[in-house]
Amino acid sequence: MVSAYVHSGEVGTQKQDDKYRFLERMLVRMPELAKHSDHVLIVGDLNVGHTELDIKNWKANQKRAGFLPEERAYFDRFFGDIGYRDVARELAGQVPGPYTWWSYRGKAFDNDAGWRIDYHMAT
């Protein structure tokens, strides 16, 4: 079991470049872990909404860190090429949410205008 935190990033900054470097390293490490065990679980706050189902207001956030196409492409590979499973999505089905983060502004929690940025990825 691996617990991970990926910082949120910020478009056009070194912080975003660091986030991409971390996600790149995950692409290398995740298959290595799977070679050593049939049961690998990676959990944590990864600060990326993978699909439109993972963020309530996805259209307005397409150019913001956390929902950039480049970030989402890493998750396509985690759940595609590398073969990990998105446990929460499998349990919830193809429906919006369940969200794991809400802004403190604009009554986001009250309106369930959240993001799903926390994951349980399993082999």
Show which residues each predicted segment covers:
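Short, solvent-exposed loop/turn segments at secondary-structure boundaries
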Residues: 13-18
